[in-house]
Amino acid sequence: MRIKITKHFLLTGLILAVLQACKPVDFTNASVQKIADLQGVPKQGYQGMAIYNDYLVSLQNTGQATIYQLSDDGLQKLHQFPLASLMPENHANVAFFGTERYKKTDEFPLFYVSQCSKQRYNGLKDVCFVERISLTEAPKLVQTIILDDTEGLFGYALQWMIDYTHNYLIGYGNTIENMGKGNRWRTMIFPMPKLSDGAVVHLQPKDAIDNYCIQDLDPRFPSNHIGQGACVIKDQMFIPVGLGTEAHPSILYIWNLKKKCLDHILNFQQQVPHEFEDCDPSHGDLIMQTNGGGAIRFKPSKK
């Protein structure tokens, strides 16, 4: 009898642990605190950002990068360098770390950067640069991912992000332009390209696992707003928007990729009257890079 009871409690505990791991994090009443000011290069706006363990990589327009040590109460600047993809056509709007390493001994996984600019790169748009970065060595461009958008499915601001849970590469962005008449926001999901796929990878719309416009599924998501970065946590896509102004407030939309609906619309304009940029999770919190307000920590409410 004791053995059966022990097994029962172990099984119950395991089920509860699995359910807790699958439960979305609630940022509805999140506490908001500034971590620190950013120390990038002058005269270039802050854009993409990615976190690996306790390293935060902050990007600026054209592809300037700064690596910080992230702690509960601050940022320690470790290294500043231009990406291998540094160029006027690289807005470097979104960044994320992948799951592969260029070499097994590399300190960081591969680093992905969304070009996301009205200016085309070698005549191309919708480009994702894949780089090998380091604290000590020069960065190296090891792969370029391109969506062959012959149908005009996206405007100029296609942002790439990774769904770690399912190993998907997700493209998200406007169909015309942020404030354009008739604009919508499209999401396309692809299997994650591998480094072994080659130096240049062309994605075709026909190969997408899913392809839809958010407004077709949930009209609460506005067609016109100032889009910023994005990231995926479990089955949710976190979409920061706005300029931190009354006309374009700092809002965080949380899109459920599984249910295909908005889970939350969170207005943080009062707490963060600055332009949201890119975001990434860190130890259960959400870290947001801003223009003018430094790095911000959103700590979920405890129930």
Locate each region found by the language model.
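Structural signature of eukaryotic scaffold interfaces centered on beta-propeller domains
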Residues: 45-52, 91-108, 154-169, 223-233, ...
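Loop/turn-rich, solvent-exposed surfaces of beta-rich toroidal or solenoidal domains
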Residues: 213-255
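Conserved blade-ending motifs and adjacent loop-strand segments that build the rim/top face
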Residues: 261-282
